[in-house]
Amino acid sequence: MCVESDGCEIEGCSSSDEVHTLSGSMSPALKSRDLHHCRPGQKFHAALLRCRTPLVAAGILSFGNVLNYMDRYTVAGVLLDIQKQFKVGDSSAGLLQTVFICSFMVAAPIFGYLGDRFNRKIILSCGIFFWSAVTLLSSFITKEYYWLLVLSRCLVGIGESSYSSISPTIIGDLFTNNKRTVMLSVFYLAIPLGSGLGYILGSIAKDAGGHWYWALRVSPMLGLTAGTLILIFVSEPKRGSADQPGGRLKTRTSWVCDMKALAKNRSYVFSSLASAAVSFATGAFGIWIPQYLVRAQVVQKSAESCTYQPCSSRDSLIFGAITCVTGLLGVVIGAVTTRLCRQKTERADPLVCAVSMLGSAIFICLIFVVAKKSIVGAYICIFIGETLLFLNWAITADILMYVVIPTRRATAVAFQGFTSHLLGDAGSPYLIGLISDSLQESYATSEIWQFLSLGYALMLCPFVIVLGGMFFLATALFFLDDRDKAAKQVNQLARPPSTVKVTK
């Protein structure tokens, strides 16, 4: 394969070869008289262009997504140490994640609007550089300024929002059909993988550096690397180029028109509500399950309560490893199962999500039944429950790509993120901590009651997961109609502007 490169002769290309442009379209070969030997700078430029392939772009974007979630959950890996240093309770500790998610979801619609209209890779890189700088600076906050740590997490949420809102749409414009499902599966594998690595990184960096501050000084360095790679190796694909090979969608609708269309898209609305249920559970679990398991071991007399820093990182490490493995299994099983089920029914995507959600709720309920007697049993239930829960991440994104036209996808991803965070993990960590604190204040404080109160608060999660399964079943009812409607609109938008009639 040869790459077009400003008339510079590329090694291995002849005058009869077809030349691939960066957008993936084919152009006639350059004639011999148009070719000349490359100067050193042109050779480097030509080599750089050859590296800008869709697979390389998807790999770099997936790496950046891993870092996004790794940074998000690094704080959770050292949460007990933060509580001891700043002397805050469960509700105040949960506030760290809540303000992060609140700023994340408020910024998401703004970045969605920008992502449908401006250069996406520039926005992505700036977002990564911003949150990396803020995270690094937050590692120097002293114990008198807990409010400043809370503010820093708020700012980090804004930076990470740009990435989550825009990067899936680039992959959507690089691939289509089953190949897009596979690439989105790899991309969304970053959610559990990055979350698990966040716990592990936080624990290891704290132990190596002797203080929890060091947990916040690793991901920024990796973030700067990811931002630079995006600028150099990720090209900006034409919007809709995968859906309409060789061209771009020529008509852009207004933001108001986009929002009206999304509000009328029943598959999009119900799948967004289902995503909110998943976010509610994962947000609460990510913050509180390691704490819950520590308290369970204190009750079983297999561990002592942490009084001084540094606290044991064992449970955060184990939970992080489980999250990584279950994330890998969940995303792979979800992608394979969906491809197989598509041979039986065209509604496979939402139905697989619904079944996995309902199955997950059962095993998550069992965590709180067995934790008092067996930590190993609790870990087994966590493993199965998380695997089933993580099945739907990539499938949900693929549902969106099917039912939303390319020129609205960044806005759709952003508002789906806004909805899932607003109704999900924006409030769940704080709500669980608040319920736990309220139960502890109602009765005499003891180690057994600290364990039970947090468990009772976390029991809210399985019921929310069941509700999410119901929303996926509702999505299945409208999925085919909405998918066909979107395909018809894509064909309309690919025509010359004078012949296009946009459905509002």
Swiss-Prot record:
Keywords: Cell membrane, Endosome, Lipid transport, Membrane, Transmembrane, Transmembrane helix, Transport. Its main location: membrane. Pfam families: MFS_1 (PF07690). One of its GO terms (cellular component) is membrane. It is found in: Cell membrane; Endosome membrane. Changing residue 153 to S: In ko157; displays cardia bifida (2 hearts). Disruption phenotype: Disrupted formation of the primitive heart tube. GO terms for biological process: branching involved in blood vessel morphogenesis; cardioblast migration to the midline involved in heart rudiment formation; embryonic heart tube morphogenesis; embryonic viscerocranium morphogenesis; lipid transport; regulation of cartilage development; regulation of humoral immune response; regulation of T cell migration. Signal peptide: none annotated. It catalyses: sphing-4-enine 1-phosphate(in) = sphing-4-enine 1-phosphate(out); sphinganine 1-phosphate(in) = sphinganine 1-phosphate(out). GO terms for molecular function: sphingolipid transporter activity; transmembrane transporter activity. It is a multi-pass membrane protein. Belongs to the major facilitator superfamily. Spinster (TC 2.A.1.49) family. Lipid transporter that specifically mediates export of sphingosine-1-phosphate (sphing-4-enine 1-phosphate, S1P) and sphinganine-1-phosphate, which play critical roles in regulating heart development. Mediates the export of S1P from cells in the extraembryonic yolk syncytial layer (YSL), thereby regulating myocardial precursor migration. This is Sphingosine-1-phosphate transporter SPNS2. It comes from Danio rerio (Zebrafish).
